[in-house]
Structures are given as structure tokens and as C-alpha cells.
Amino acid sequence: MSLKDHLIHNVHKEEHAHAHNKISVVGVGAVGMACAISILMKDLADELTLVDVVEDKLKGEMLDLQHGSLFLKTPKIISGKDYSVTAHSKLVIVTAGARQQEGESRLNLVQRNVNIFKFIIPNVVKYSPDCKLLIVSNPVDILTYVAWKISGFPKHRVIGSGCNLDSARFRHLMGERLGIHPLSCHGWIVGEHGDSSVPVWSGVNVAGVSLKALHPDMGTDADKEHWKEVHKQVVDSAYEVIKLKGYTSWAIGLSVADLAETIMKNLRRVHPISTAVKGMHGIKDDVFLSVPCVLGSSGITDVVKMILKPDEEEKIKKSADTLWGIQKELQF
């Protein structure tokens, strides 16, 4: 008899059941690992799987997380180069791909990352045909479209992390100006995750009090308080962090875990995330952009119809045109 047999009397032989709340993260770079640790700290999964092509780094990251098991409540953390390890995932988060260099626009990454997606997405679909796909790799709006096209999934199950982070950055900066916690500062950034994102000034409020009603010049060039700068800071923030530390990781990791929580717990919270927007706001092409979406365990179930000012609507259309111009040239 082994020590284990001396210690433990077996009552019931457990069949190897699948995990019920499995999350897989594809790509164990700085962003993938920030997503992983944020998800682990929120106890969202009963199994977390990591996938990457660099096997030593992958195994090292897995071991490093496993060594923290005592402090976590996710009983199984595994990894592998082969996508069979991702089988039966509820949620698959894709962070893999080339990342922005200093001064490089997100749109510049596109063809490199499309080629990577041509390998990743079919493998994910093969092993988890019923999963929700959450795309984080940049340019996120275009790659969410690419993932939707390659996967053959219905639109509601292919989600881009989109402007969830841009809106969080906006609310943080707004809070800094007003001396109020970002949770109590309400404001939405929609459109492209990146340089052509659109701040919806008409909806910015604290406790339901419209800031634009109190300060009509808000967000315009005539504004003495230069609130437009807040949006400029949001657009510049990734570039600034990349310039200073080489990459961004923590904020996007927390933002993705926020979305994962809404999905895994079926919270039906509204998030500014990337979805198919054809037919909305005068957009005629098959593009994915961030709009306020109701998110839950089946993916995106509804879109909130924003009331936009004509100039805001115009900016969203321009965003869509920019993306379509790139999308229609893509080879996949």
C-alpha cells in the first residue's frame, strides 16, 4: 500500500469530467500573462490553459503560475503548444501576434497578424466549437472581423476587447480631473480601438448630471478647460506606455478579465466592445467597431442604440471607412 492509500480511503471513483468553466489564453507574452493573472485573481475559471509556440517560455509561465496555486482558487493550470489542450473551453482569449513597436500604429500590424490568425483560429474552433472568442491582438477591430470570417462562428460569439480599455482610461483621466473615483465617472469611447476612437461627450456624466449641459464647450476647440485633451491623452496613452516600458500589459489584462467576468458569470453588463456594426450609424460595410454591447454567457446579445450628435456619427463613419479600406485588401 502506498502512503496515499494509507492516508485516504476512496469513496467514489471519479470519471474524468470536462471542466465546466474553462478559459484558454492564446499567447503568453506580456498581455496574455496579464490576462491570465487577472483572471486567476478573480476566480473565474476551474481550468486555465495557456497556448503558445515558444515552448520553453510557455512551460516557464505555466510553472510560475502553478507555484502560486496555494494562493489561487483555480485547481488546474495547464499549457501546451498543441491546441488539443484547449478542448471544451467556454472562453478563448487570443492575445498572440506581433506587437506594436514604439511609434507604430495598431493598423500597421495587420497583415502580420492576419497570417498568425490563419493558424490559430481554425485550431481553436476545432477543439472548442461552442466557445466565445475574445480577440485582444491588434489592430483588434480588424482582427475580430478576421477571426469571425475564419471561424465561421455567429457574430455574437466573436468579440473584440475594443474600447473597453479606452473607456476605462477616459474615466480614469476624468476622475483625476474631478477628484472622483472612475466608477462614478461615466463616459463612453466608441469606434476604433486606436487613433480614430470617438468620445461621446454628450453622454459624459457624474451621478446623471451631464457635464456638457454644465459646460457646453466641452470637447470642442473653444473649450477653455481643454477637455478635448482628455481624449487625446486616451489615444496617446498606449504610445506613451510603450515608449516608457516597451509594451502595455496590466491595464489591458485587467480590462480583459473584466470582460471575462461578465461572460463567465452571465452578468449582462454593457461594455464598449467590438462587434459587427453594419447597418448601425449609417455604416454600410462589414466592419467591427466598438459600440455599447450587452454581454453575457452566450456572447453579445444586444447593442444599445446610442444617440449620437451628427459630428460623432460622422467620426464613427470615418472610422468604419478607414477600417474597411484596410480590410478589403486583406489576404486570408
UniProtKB/Swiss-Prot annotation:
Its EC number is 1.1.1.27. Its main location: cytoplasm. NAD(+) binds at residues 29-57, 99, 138. The keyword Oxidoreductase applies. InterPro entries: L-lactate/malate_DH (IPR001557), L-lactate_DH (IPR011304), L-lactate_DH_AS (IPR018177), Lactate/malate_DH_C (IPR022383), Lactate/malate_DH_N (IPR001236), Lactate_DH/Glyco_Ohase_4_C (IPR015955), NAD(P)-bd_dom_sf (IPR036291). GO terms for cellular component: cytosol; mitochondrion. GO terms for biological process: lactate metabolic process; pyruvate metabolic process. It catalyses: (S)-lactate + NAD(+) = pyruvate + NADH + H(+). Homotetramer. This is L-lactate dehydrogenase A chain. The gene is LDHA.
